[in-house]
Regions:
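Mature N-terminal, pre-catalytic/accessory segment of carbohydrate-active enzymes
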Residues: 3-96, 102, 651-663, 672-677, ...
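Aromatic-Pro/Gly-enriched surface loop or interdomain linker
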Residues: 369-470
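Active-site mouth of glycoside hydrolases
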Residues: 38-245
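Glycoside hydrolase catalytic-domain groove-lining segments
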Residues: 226-230, 235-303, 336
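Substrate-binding cleft of secreted/luminal carbohydrate-active enzymes
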Residues: 298, 304, 311-348
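A conserved amphipathic helix/loop scaffold
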Residues: 482-743
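Aromatic-rich peripheral "rim/lid" segments of glycoside hydrolase catalytic domains that contact
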Residues: 167, 334-395, 408-410
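Active-site clefts of carbohydrate-active enzymes
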Residues: 194-200, 264-266, 279-314, 352-361, ...
Length: 744
């Protein structure tokens, strides 16, 4: 199931950035009743657990090859055969759709014959050792399909009080029926809400009320099973079901990264660096709400991309998101549509939807099937509890504005402490359809650049206390530094804490656009904005100091300025830089006109780095941008070097993305090769680290039947060969308490 990104549509009370200072981890809100104390599956401190042991589901969504409207076409036998093949492939879980119109064809009247079929589908899953993940109320599914209700046609089920009550009763009945099922891994409230046909009429408040009603009904009648929602594009589209709105009612959140449907964010080829970071990016963004996150759907059509390219894409997506903290994986989907289904909706209208299978319509495996098999074997082979049970190590924070989490919240206006006038923000009239995409472009490209620099980042939410991150690095790319649209920037009072953060040892990075406005900039950054920068088609920064491995005298070309000029940088101030004047900041690069372009100001134990150009938003304008030869990542490496941050174990290359997971016994380095070629790199490790072992995951390793890719013992300094599109999984143990990284 995929939602076209062109369709638009309370949060957990985390306060500010209250993570432990040592790790910078985002603390989860109190799960309360949402985490079942009894039951076959529970949530641990990071991973899901099955009967006490870490369990990472690696599975697939099953749609019968005859089409998504399966209740009218097939019975349990089709599911049984598919589950048998999944189990033989090493997959451990299957997600299925329960179509509302089939389960409840009349208001309040359940179809007992159909439910008996679903009973037998549960039995089939159990018999093959496959956990089952049922999705309720499926309405939107595959292409443009919306399976309507015959007794409530055209009514928005997320907003209509009567339909919300009906769904609560429906969920309660199913919970009572299947609460004893140990093969049921978790309830999925529905697939990709808001239902596509009702995107424009569903609000944040609707999403919250609907989620409250259905989760309450499930938990009152089945307190022993986990609950989630299979959301797609909600974080990157600013949709009403984004994790900030609903995640505190769930046991884990979900993302369905489909960058192929978001050219406004990913104007790229399938194996481009941005594309293959989409799952890790969305995982990290949703994790900022304090809930674990599953990569709950992903894939690409073999009708549009070569099957071997799709396999490389899946491998990079899965392993990089695992390094970013993902706790489960469900591919879309198990099998292609059969040719006889091509004449029927939705396939007759959406031909690409026929070819997403791990296997073709005749059950012949495609290369991506081996990727999932290898992932499943590795998840069972790794000591995830001891080496990764604490989740990802993230030394950098990219903040999420409060307005994104809770738009137009009266508490954010600062008028409740004393008598004040009846303030109403005119911004709601100026911009009734708020565009979140400039913010997401800034986040996304900042995340990719930080990944290239070996600086794993998290996305903590801004609070009303103006607290700064607990991490040693704060990355604030444009438009977070801007003004005018409150959706896109930090609160004005947030900047009052910048100097204190830096003086206590934090390193701040800012990129500026012609929209930037920070009252305290001169005091904490040692520079001031003089004017808007000239609009130029080609901006080259001449280095006057060392920057991320580049020497003084070298030139750093800012990609995207020519594209931005064509796109109208003269009128879109987010794509235009600023002219800076340095006070006490060191100038590390200048423009062709001699103006400061990159500066560094020392403040107490920390520092502030300012870039005069919105390099992240400019990179977003370049198709297939942030490629192997793009040098802008060096600015982020300057940030890392200035902070003195480094992981405990590393394969140090800007062509790799490295995620670090830690546990009580050691850690795991997940290095994914997003470059255009094979790499051979020396393994670096801190002195406290021992027991190094290396596993290479690529197409050759995945072809070995019946087992995980082999591990080999290693020592610091050993060369590690990592093929293009592959992943290196390096595990280590430690003799004493030692986190995922350190500051020198």
């Amino acid at each position: 199931m995929r939602m076209n990104s062109r369709q638009k549509g309370g949060r957990p009370e985390l306060g500010g950035y209250h993570a432990p200072a040592e790790s910078g981890r985002i603390a989860a809100p109190d799960a309360g009743e949402s985490n079942p104390a009894e039951g076959p599956y529970t949530m641990g401190r990071h991973f899901m657990r099955r009967k006490g042991a870490v369990y990472v589901p690696v599975g697939v969504h099953y749609v019968p090859r005859s089409g998504p409207d399966w209740p009218w076409r097939v019975d349990e036998a089709e599911f049984d055969a598919a589950f048998a093949r999944m189990a033989a492939s090493g997959l451990t879980s299957a997600r299925i759709d329960l179509l509302w119109a089939a389960v409840e064809p009349e208001r309040g009247g359940m179809d007992e014959d159909h439910l008996a079929v679903v009973d037998r589908i549960f039995d089939a899953a159990r018999s093959h050792g496959v956990s089952l993940h049922p999705t309720l109320f499926v309405g939107g599914e595959v292409g443009d399909a919306y399976w309507d209700l015959p007794w409530a046609s055209g009514v928005n089920p997320h907003a209509d009080p009567g339909l919300i009550e009906a769904q609560a009763r429906h969920a309660a009945a199913l919970a009572r029926r299947w609460r004893g099922r140990e093969e049921l891994i978790a309830w999925d409230l529905t697939d990709e809400p808001p239902f596509w046909i009702h995107c424009a009429t569903t609000t944040d408040a609707d999403a919250r009320r609907w989620t409250d009603a259905v989760t309450t009904a499930l938990r009152e009648n089945d307190p022993g099973h986990l609950v989630t929602i299979g959301t797609a594009s909600q974080e990157v589209d600013g949709g009403p079901f984004r994790a900030d709105v609903v995640a505190d009612r769930l046991d884990f959140a979900c993302v369905h990264p489909y960058p192929i449907y978001s050219p406004e964010l990913y104007p790229d080829r399938l194996l481009s660096r941005r594309m293959t970071h989409s799952a890790a990016f969305e995982t990290a963004l949703a994790r900022g709400t304090g809930r674990p996150v599953m990569v709950h759907e992903f894939g690409a059509s073999s009708a549009q991309f070569a099957p071997e390219a799709v396999a490389d894409y899946d491998r990079l997506m899965c392993w990089s998101s695992f390094g970013a903290g993902a706790v489960g994986f469900y591919a879309w989907c198990w099998i292609d549509a059969e040719p006889g289904a091509y004449r029927r909706a939705p396939y007759v209208r959406m031909p690409h939807e026929t070819q997403f299978g791990l296997v073709d319509a005749d059950s012949r495996p495609r290369p991506r099937a081996a990727v999932l098999t290898g992932l499943a074997h590795a998840m069972q082979d790794l000591d995830l509890d001891g080496l990764a049970g604490d989740g990802p190590w993230c030394p950098a924070s990219i903040p999420v504005p409060y307005e994104y989490s809770r738009p137009y919240d009266r508490a954010s206006y600062g008028l409740d402490d004393a008598p004040a006038g009846p303030y109403v923000p005119s911004e709601a009239a100026w911009e009734p359809e708020r565009d979140v995409k400039p913010l997401v472009r800034g986040w996304l490209n900042s995340y990719v650049l930080a990944s290239r620099a070996g600086l794993p980042a998290q996305f903590p939410r801004e609070g009303l206390d103006d607290a700064w991150p607990a991490t040693p690095v704060a990355l604030l790319p444009a438009p977070l530094t801007s003004t005018t649209s409150s959706l896109l920037h930090m609160r004005t009072s947030f900047w009052q804490g910048a100097l204190d953060y830096a003086e206590r040892g934090g390193v701040i990075y800012l990129s500026c656009s012609a929209e930037t406005a920070i009252p305290e900039l001169a005091s904490f950054a040692g520079v001031e904005i003089v004017d808007r920068a000239p609009v130029e088609g080609d901006v080259r920064l001449m280095l006057t100091g060392a920057v991320g491995g580049m020497d003084p005298g070298q030139t750093l070309t800012v990609a995207g300025t020519e594209a931005a000029a064509r796109a109208g940088a003269a009128t879109d101030l987010h794509l235009r830089g600023v002219q800076l004047r340095a006070a006490d900041a060191q100038v590390l690069a200048v423009t062709s006109r001699g103006a400061p372009a990159l500066t560094l100001a020392r403040r107490g134990k920390g520092a502030v780095i300012v870039c005069a150009y919105p390099i992240e938003l400019l990179a977003a304008e370049v198709p297939d941008g942030l490629g192997d030869d793009d040098p802008v990542w060096a600015i982020y490496r300057l940030v890392r070097d200035t902070a003195g941050v480094r992981p405990a174990v590393d394969l140090d290359s800007s062509l790799l993305t490295r995620g670090i997971l830690t546990g009580e016994a050691g850690g795991i380095l997940v290095a994914t090769n997003h470059s255009a070629g094979d790499l051979t790199l020396p393994l670096r490790a801190d002195a406290e680290v021992n027991g190094l072992r290396v596993r290479i995951v690529d197409s050759a390793a995945e072809e070995r039947p019946g087992a995980a890719a082999p591990q080999a013992a290693a020592t610091a300094g050993d060369d590690v060969h990592l093929p293009r599109g592959g992943a290196a999984i390096v595990t280590w143990k430690r003799a004493a308490a030692h986190g995922g990284g350190r500051r020198s």
